[in-house]
């Protein structure tokens, strides 16, 4: 609160006038009175409670029977969003009300904590997609699988089938702890510092669906890895644990908080603590409780952990964590070592038990349910019963005997899942886009897939010269679900002026990236004034800027480094 100089008024007592400030909606400071419609809906009824109404009322009564506060609010707590109505162009996204944009079908997000799937579970997801979702699935960049074209009448049966094999959609969306990211090679990699699976399982078992965390200010994202490649995009999660080796205390985790992208990107920061493995769940509970109790709730666009961290700083965050929420302070700890290895795990790799895992590239995450079923069959026919999606829209087949590796590689190729993809197929991810998302302005997956095909044709002979995966991330709106600010080439969907005409296109971000081998620290991409790309021009722009990079780079210079030093003209 700012304090002004005393103001003198004739005939009145002199007093200090204060600039009035509105409460931020912090429960621990301002109390729990709801300060906006979303908070009112959450206070009126916990989002977890809507499941019973879905099963007993809405599935019987159909879409028209759904209460709007459930449809546009609480359904998310069970992984359900209404889809975008087909045929509404991106220019109308901001003009129409949400109910005018929505179809009477749902996207359903299947929660896959740590990406840990059995082939039986994968087959069930594929069968559900084929039977109830028009044979369309998307692997997301948060290790989830999303189904489309789901009718409310079918939701209880889908839940029954998922839960019969140990899957669920609990808190897959909403103002809750979202799917927990974990290294896709947890427990199998020869070079991991520690297997984070026990810590992941403890958090999930204790806190998934816990009403004490079912009303957070907004979404809350967690990541944990024990792998030296730092393969869980920890810098852009609300709470992350990255394996480190303490000189006196052994292997544990470095704690990061406050990362997120969207329209106001902010990279997470270290609190400087060492978290022993046995205290990870306690520390996660403490950080999450801080967000619940002190997070800003009045304005939705300020309600992420990153805004609280920006105001508090890391010293206060650590002090509040240790003094108010932990049983005892944490020791100081070292920063993670520079990353080693490719975090997407594409290719054939030996496991610590002598078997192999094989990482394959999807095409921007889009797969049919039939393909998922065939993938489960392929894995099982070759001795594997485990698969794992990654945070890069890739998928791993685990536990393959050495003599079966060639058979799996060939089978993956037949499924359109190459384990030796081009640099462009390997490096490209895309969000859902205008096909299904009510927030989107531009098509993403089809445009990105077309660009991959074109770049493979035009630049195939240059791949040895390029010598690195140049990441291309395509997003349909400013919210950055596809992490555009942390890509070599990030494309943000918007309407752009091309030759005097307003058309769907993209704003370009260049030179972003998270910590990886050859890049010690994360950094956000730059934008170039006036640089816009039409929706059908992704490959044209990418080819142009890659060829300029090859012509202008210094020896050993990465694309990201070059993009930050190049002048605007070179980046057009």
Each predicted region: which residue ranges?
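Peripheral terminal and linker regions in Fe-S/redox and tRNA-modifying enzymes
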Residues: 2-572
């Amino acid at each position: 609160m700012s304090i002004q100089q005393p103001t003198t008024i004739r005939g009145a007592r002199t007093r200090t006038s204060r600039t009035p400030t509105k409460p931020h909606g912090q429960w621990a400071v301002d109390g729990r009175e709801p300060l906006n419609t979303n908070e009112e809906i959450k206070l009126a009824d916990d989002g977890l409670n809507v499941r019973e109404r879905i099963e007993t009322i809405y599935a019987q009564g159909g879409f028209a029977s759904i209460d709007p506060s459930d449809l546009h609010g609480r359904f998310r707590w069970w992984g359900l969003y209404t889809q975008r109505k087909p045929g509404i162009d991106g220019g109308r996204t901001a003009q129409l009300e949400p109910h005018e944009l929505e179809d009477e079908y749902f996207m359903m997000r299947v929660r896959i904590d740590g990406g840990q799937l059995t082939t039986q579970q994968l087959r069930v997801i594929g069968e559900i997609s084929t039977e109830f979702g028009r044979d369309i699935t998307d692997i997301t960049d948060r290790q989830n699988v999303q189904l489309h074209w789901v009718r409310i009448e079918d939701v209880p049966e889908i839940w029954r089938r998922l839960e019969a094999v140990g899957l669920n959609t609990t808190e897959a969306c909403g103002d809750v702890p979202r799917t927990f990211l974990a290294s896709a090679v947890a427990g199998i990699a020869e070079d991991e510092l520690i297997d984070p699976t026990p810590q992941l399982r403890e958090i999930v078992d204790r806190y998934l669906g816990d009403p004490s965390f079912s009303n957070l200010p907004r979404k809350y994202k967690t990541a944990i890895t024990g792998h030296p490649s730092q393969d869980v995009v920890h810098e852009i999660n609300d709470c992350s644990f990255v394996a480190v080796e303490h000189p006196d205390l052994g292997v544990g985790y470095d704690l990061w908080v406050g990362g997120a992208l969207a329209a106001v990107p902010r990279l997470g920061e270290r609190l400087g603590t060492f978290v022993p493995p046995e205290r990870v769940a306690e520390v996660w509970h403490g950080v999450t409780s801080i967000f619940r109790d002190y997070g800003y709730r009045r304005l939705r666009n300020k309600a992420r952990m990153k805004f609280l961290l920006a105001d508090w700083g890391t010293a206060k965050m650590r002090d509040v964590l240790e003094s108010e929420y932990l049983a005892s302070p944490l020791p100081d700890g070292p920063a993670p070592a520079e990353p080693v290895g490719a975090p997407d795990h594409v290719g054939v790799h030996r496991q610590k038990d002598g078997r192999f895992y094989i990482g394959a590239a999807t095409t921007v995450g889009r797969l049919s349910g039939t393909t998922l079923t065939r993938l489960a069959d392929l894995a099982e026919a070759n001795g594997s019963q485990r698969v794992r999606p990654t945070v890069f829209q890739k998928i791993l087949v685990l536990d393959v005997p050495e003599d079966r590796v060639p058979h799996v590689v060939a089978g993956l190729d037949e499924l359109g899942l190459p384990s030796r993809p081009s640099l462009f197929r390997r490096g490209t991810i895309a969000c859902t886009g205008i096909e299904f998302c009510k927030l989107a302005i531009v098509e993403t997956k089809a445009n990105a897939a077309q660009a991959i095909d074109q770049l493979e044709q035009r630049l195939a002979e240059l791949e040895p010269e390029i010598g690195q995966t140049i990441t291309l991330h395509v997003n349909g709106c400013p919210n950055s679900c596809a992490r555009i600010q942390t890509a070599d080439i990030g494309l943000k969907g918007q309407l752009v002026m091309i030759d005097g005409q307003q058309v769907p296109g993209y704003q370009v971000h260049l030179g972003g990236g998270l910590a990886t081998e050859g890049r010690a620290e994360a950094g956000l991409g730059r934008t170039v004034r006036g640089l816009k790309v039409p929706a059908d021009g992704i490959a044209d722009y990418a080819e142009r800027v890659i060829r300029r990079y090859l012509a202008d780079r210094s020896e050993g210079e990465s694309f990201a480094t070059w993009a930050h030093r190049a002048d605007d003209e070179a980046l057009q």
